[in-house]
Amino acid sequence: MISDLKEERLLPAVPGRSNQIELLRVTSKLLEQLQSKNTFPKELDNPLGCQLELTHRCNLRCNQCYNQSGCSKPDISFDKWMDVTRQLVDMSIFECVISGGEPLLLKDKLYKLMDILSNSGVRFIFVTNGLLLDERKVKRLSKYDYYWIQVSIDGSRPEIHDKIRGVKGSWKKAVNAAKLVSQAGLPLVISHVIQKDNIEYLDEMIKTSYLLGAKRMITGKFTFSGRAILNRKSIDVGYDKIRKAYQLLKIRHNEYEGKMDIVTSTDPAFYLRYRVIEPSNVLLIRPNGDVKVDCILPFKIGNVLNEKISSIWNRIGKSAWKNNEIIEYVKSIKEERDMISTRPRPYVDEDVLIR
């Protein structure tokens, strides 16, 4: 599975990981040694964390959206989400990613869910497009403990961001949201997806993120998933351009060291193999209740409407990455573009249920 990769076909990593394939080999060997001595688990009794995609609804229509947020599919009831959070507390998770869609569309109900988790010591990553974030909401969000609050900004200029995100005026609101988060003393992360319309302005975006007070900028080429697959002809950039962009990111990473972290998203072929190597440790729950083990893996392992989360985890979740169907899919992704042709395609085709 590792030997079929070619380093030159992987997206570069910033910072470090100059040889990603060697890292996979070393990690795999080390885990095998530790597990053979029973000093590192092969399976976990409970997941360490969970991502909650609280709604399909979104107030933007981003042309690269990995899960096609903004569709008209039904969400599970709020009462069910309350039940889900209580189940996760019973499973003693440590961290929770709050996302969507746009989670702030839940209005006051959002805080009820976060209260349940927070009261049990859960720490959050909060992902928002920033359109609905104002001083009042930032104040309410300030009561929780965060790894970071992530605001997505896909352009250093209004016309770039608004074109990518499909709504005029969205850049101004996103930038204001980032300022409010930073000024409140909360850990701000700017997420920036590189594509055809913004790649020439990457250096500007780095400076913009720093000026907004971000502690980190997470960036990288879009993932071939969801709307990015459907719109790939209009947003794709070639290997030469993307590699030059990553060279710039490496330079700026060194220049901004100690002031702002600049990190890149991980190449899917590398990332999926890394997940196969390590024990399953997280879950993702979709707005319709489907339970998955990863956001770009086109498989589901159950639904919270039909089964308790602990039962799903014990039945298949904790060993899901060792499932033959998943392993064969991972083997088929030798470079990022294989996600276009390999079936099922994430968030384009129906997820396959594994048992």
Regions inferred by a protein language model and the residue ranges of each:
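Flexible mid-to-C-terminal extensions adjoining Fe-S/redox cofactors in radical SAM and related proteins
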Residues: 2-15, 23-34, 294-355
